């Protein structure tokens, strides 16, 4: 064990512990923007700097380890001034129009800036923008990127896809698709990990609310019968945004909220998930009868992100995938076929919406093969949990 002092409070931590982790163990708040434990510990944001007795310069706490007898100060005037300057520098290259930002109220940069209370004085802004294909389910806004490198590291070390990389040099350094490629050429699996770990709104899912909720959207114009399906994950996650208890945020209340929004019919995708299991199970048993005719093992095809990953990284194993559709697309096909017949409605006159936790679903619904009626997509629009709430 190593004995240290943090803000004059003596504590003991294991040898090799970073200063940041030691501070967190002692319940001392040290803000961070770029830090991800064991994934991104590069000290790029310089917001986690602390003062160490006997050392003139401030040090980053995320990638420096504790030493015996070290005395650390996390909130000295010198530290606070340095953090304010670093945040001001970051904001000088950041699009600060927060009211319309999808991450407003849930933005790490916004929180750190508010906590530091540095007033109105900022540096002259120099914001850069890059063109991006807005029809792609993953959207990158260069004007909001703070160069924390989280997306690069999470894609490299967790997903192993290496979609992102550092681009340009010097003061022009930024993050972009690796090898100068267009995102559509980068074999992105649309797993959403880079969006989840981005501390700001530089990365987000494509916003598809307009055709559903806008003044000219289907819920307001009532031009078609509107049907919505909800994924099991959304059923349990939607209440977090409203800080509702698990008991209060029941599936019945969710269905009621959707009906109040204007949807004519509400379905639970759990039903289609059961159909997927039955379909894949039956296919597996059929393959077992003729082992020599199939490539093994057999993989599920229920996740479009997984299917995209396999097709791009292991094309020789595509035949291992089940031929079954995902639950979303099975439910969409049921709505446009069986259900349309039950309510005596033309499939063309049904607007099918899916609320899912994954942006890969947005790409899946647009595949040309996902048209079981020949009248258009089985699922017209996919909304993620954030868009729904």
Protein language model features and the residues they cover:
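Short structural boundary motif marking the start of a folded domain
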Residues: 1-4
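Iron-sulfur-associated redox domains of electron-transfer enzymes in respiratory
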Residues: 15-69, 75, 79, 206-389
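Residue-level recognition of alpha-helix initiation/capping sites
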Residues: 14, 136, 146, 189, ...
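A short N-terminal beta-strand-loop micro-motif at the entrance of redox/enzyme domains
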Residues: 9-15
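Fe-S ferredoxin-like electron-transfer domains
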Residues: 46-190, 196, 200-225
